[in-house]
Amino acid sequence: MFQGSIVAIVTPFKNGAVDEEKLRELVEFQIENGTDAIVPCGTTGESSTLSYVEHDRVIQVVVEQVNKRVPVIAGTGSNSTHEAIEITQHAKELGADGALLVTPYYNKPSQEGLFRHYKAVADAVALPQILYNVPGRTGVNLLPETVARLSVHQNIVAIKEATGSLQQASEVLALCGDKIDVLSGDDFITLPIMAAGGKGVISVTANIMPKEVSSLVDAFNAGNMEEARRLHLYLLKISNAMFIESNPVPVKAAVSLMGKCSSEVRLPLAPLMEANLAKLTAIMKEYKLI
């Protein structure tokens, strides 16, 4: 259902507030450059430091600006199941086409707890939902066996697999078959995951190089493996640079260097350290982005 190059879009700020004008411009930049779907309020969108009102407004602005040209998949995860249901319902009411739900963080539920959490949200809200597994940030790993149990639910359509493990993504594919789509959550293994049967990527790098990320996915889907491999290797350095510090600090700095919005992040995130900013600037010059 949700396939291709999907951007986890940044949330631009200006003097502490959401910069709606720049957000709309970023949406246009994505659509003009071939992005297949947009995820507002994900990790890259700093959802954890948005108020409930801001969270809803960011989704609303993106839905309005997209105007049905591509799917909008709203980040609606929470470590409270009740809250996740409420946020997902709000996203549906605002016109989102789907929801991306990160595994509950900090409270470290068991696999049974994870299963019940996701099932409860999927039972409560009739909206296509993407599981989001990123144990490096949440402290819990959604195992392939649990994904397989969830994959039979009609409202659970995909998983963003961001363990960085090709083995785990492959195990999900082996266990679930065509019952659920697997999307890479790490730009640097998009091509390997697609080669194993994945359907695309939810990308950080696409914030600054949407055309190239989209072209990689399109080349693979067209059977042009030589071009897909070339783009995969070409994008490795810039994709790795997006994690020179915690996401989304580097990508926001990169977008700012391109003149598209402020690099402003919200505490407890801090601006990119000067030494890392110098490294990022040099890499972006190599790619002729600035």
Swiss-Prot record:
Keywords (A to Z) from UniProt: Amino-acid biosynthesis, Cytoplasm, Diaminopimelate biosynthesis, Lyase, Lysine biosynthesis, Schiff base
One GO CC term, this protein: cytosol
Site feature Part of a proton relay during catalysis, where: T43, Y106
Compartments (UniProt record): Cytoplasm
Enzyme Commission designation: 4.3.3.7
InterPro entries referenced in this protein's UniProt entry, alphabetically: Aldolase_TIM (IPR013785), DapA (IPR005263), DapA-like (IPR002220), Schiff_base-form_aldolases_AS (IPR020625), Schiff_base-form_aldolases_CS (IPR020624)
UniProt subunit comment: Homotetramer; dimer of dimers.
Name of the featured protein: 4-hydroxy-tetrahydrodipicolinate synthase
Organism from which the protein derives: Citrifermentans bemidjiense (strain ATCC BAA-1014 / DSM 16622 / JCM 12645 / Bem)
